[in-house]
Amino acid sequence: MYQVIFTFENGATPVTATAAPGETLLETARAANVAIDAPCSGNGSCGKCRVKLLEGTVEGLQTSHITDEDYAAGWRLSCASKVSSDVTVMVPDIASAYQSRMKTADLSTGEEVAIFTQLEEDLKAAGVDFSNDFVETEVAMEEPTLEDTMPDTERLTMVLEAALGCDKVRLSYPTVHKLARVLRESGFHVAVAGTLQDGVFQAMDVRNANEPQPMCGLAIDIGTTTVSAVITDLKTGKLLAKGSGGNGQIRYGADVINRIVEQGRPGGVERLQKAIVEETLQPLTKALCASAKVDADRILRCCVASNTTMNHLLLGVDADPVRMEPYIPTFFHWDGLKAGDIRFVANPDAKVVLAPNIGSYVGGDITAGTLTSRIWDKDEFSLFIDLGTNGEIVFGNRDFMMSCACSAGPAFEGGDISCGMRATDGAVEAVTIDRETLEPTLSIVGKAGQKPVGICGSGIIDVIAELYRTSAISAKGHFVRENRRILRDEHGMGRYVLAFSNESDTGREIAITEVDIECFIRAKGAIFSAIHIMLSSLDMDVSVLEHIYVAGGIGSGINMENAVRIGMFPDVDRALFQYIGNSSLAGAYALALSNAAEEKVHELASNMTYLELSTEPKYMEEFVAACFLPHTNKELFPSSVQE
């Protein structure tokens, strides 16, 4: 066995692991819980798992992702480097910290809470009542004596029945477990929180009445790449904390297919469940509790919106049938789940609500997002597009809805792009390029003066659209102009440099390559061809659309003009487009606060038709036609012109 020491560019504490001869650095890192970004799940195709060899030797051929200069400097792909001695390697920020760092939001400006406030108003206007069964009551009791020996549970039950006027009181195990201590520390003056339904009060938490904390709901959006969550006051709806972080499963692959393949290996289900629960949700929720200044026991309801595969892996359920014809998941919805069942940082007795799935590749994130978009409450035809790894689309109105997923891949969230990253600090989120000089102007996420680290989805859309507009690239995405920012490697592959090494925050060049552009063209082609096939299956075209709602966490917002220019969205009146942000998280927030919203989302799921694109005979033909800028049929995009 060899010793492998992982050091980190950001100065984090080194991790020491052991590796068997022939084991790759990526395999060793995974076993040691060292996060190295590997969107391709270690098959060598993405080039993102770069590490720097500081000491020792590894075996493995140099790949096209490592230049001669970088190879000489010690850079290796961890998936292609087999350990052959004791080694020390450095994991760069772009492969770890920038992709997985948790971030809590500043709620003081009001910008972060606007979508949630507006959602409550919109759903109420649509007839969805925003109320729930949670109540908290403050009670005082006589302290026991030698003459009054009534047990604590009976003493509490008696006063609760009188205070609430209910027929029956049930005390949860967490409540009873700490009851004796809380009663005596509080002088038998406590506040008890729980649900009141049909005359039965289910007590979930008891605390000192002089130390009040709100009853809280936890809403979570589990994306394939990014996980976002909020803590909200269950009675007022006030947002108490909001944050996000990378999905810890990312090191096992950027898309759901790679995750399913990994979970099929020995111990894979347990590894992937641990990655999402213990390595992602637990630390994120703890950070949110600290930000909100509430104890985890005060989280009394948890609502999760995620795709079908993420739901299965969250619960530790085999997801392999999802990818195998006829694509049948183990479940669409799951009732009776408690936070303690899956080790959530919350009151163990808190109900976990999973937004229902619709099909193998259209999950609860889309039903929650559809709830948010309110296309179900409109007479006119609307399109809802979620720009995530799966690329889900819903079309319809109050009379019917149809959904599909088009496997766009992780490009919209920076995956499969050589310098791609999530929309966190340092991400290039908007780009304009001068027609004559090809010099870029960049908008970067973060504080003033932030240097670029990589490029997120909205920035990728912009740079490809701008390169096409300025005639720097062809319809196939190949570079056709010469310029100081258009460079080529020894194999002739071109790249456009957004930031030279001395201009970036990492000291490395930030560029978009022809391979990146081709990858993104496939992703945008999947979106447009899915829209086209869905409408065609109903004998309709884009002329019927009156609203297009675009969701996803790919940046602060998409430049719709550029999205149309590259052929991702239909060339219709731009006033039809509305970017609605993380609609999945907003939907989970509604589920946390409203019993009626939970009923509504199940109704939406049961009434939505699922279109399986793989069975549509013309889909591949349409997809291939859409894999050009903007399309092989340029008549579909009259406004997309080159200068």
Language-model segments: residues:
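Iron-sulfur (Fe-S) cluster-binding segments and ferredoxin-like electron-carrier domains
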Residues: 28-37, 48-98
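Phosphate/pyrophosphate-binding loops at sites that engage ATP/ADP/AMP, CoA/4′-phosphopantetheine
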Residues: 281-300, 531-546
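Short glycine/threonine-rich loop-to-helix capping motif typified by GTGT followed
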Residues: 306-321, 492, 540-543, 552-571, ...
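A contiguous, well-structured pocket-lining segment that forms one wall/lid of small-molecule binding clefts
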Residues: 468-538
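N-terminal phosphate-binding loop and adjacent alpha-helix
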Residues: 248-290, 416, 427-432, 519-522, ...
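Nucleotide/phosphate-binding catalytic cleft detector across ATP-hydrolyzing
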Residues: 70-72, 77-219, 224, 273, ...
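Catalytic phosphate/nucleotide-handling subdomain of diverse soluble enzymes
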Residues: 397-402, 406, 540-604
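Glycine-rich phosphate-binding loop of actin/hexokinase-like ATP-binding domains
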Residues: 220-224, 229-257, 321-334, 368, ...
